[in-house]
């Protein structure tokens, strides 16, 4: 293996949409950083059978709906 070509692998805290927190190792962020998830397996429609409403953080869903509202889909 070549030296000094791999990203830094460290411990981060992940906060799920229901507030559950856990620690894992990742190359994301810096040591001790917190990753707040907007969608996780407990809230994603693919894993909940479509029963969960999408959370519109940043206005992306409403922007999409406004853009394509005339199509009647």
Swiss-Prot record:
One of its GO terms (molecular function) is rRNA binding. The keyword Protease does not apply. It comes from the Bacteria. One of its GO terms (biological process) is translation. InterPro entries: Ribosomal_bL28/bL31-like_sf (IPR034704), Ribosomal_bL31 (IPR002150), Ribosomal_bL31_A (IPR027491), Ribosomal_bL31_sf (IPR042105). NCBIfam families: L31, PRK00528.1. Belongs to the bacterial ribosomal protein bL31 family. Type A subfamily. Binds the 23S rRNA. HAMAP family: Ribosomal_bL31_1. This is Large ribosomal subunit protein bL31. The gene is rpmE.
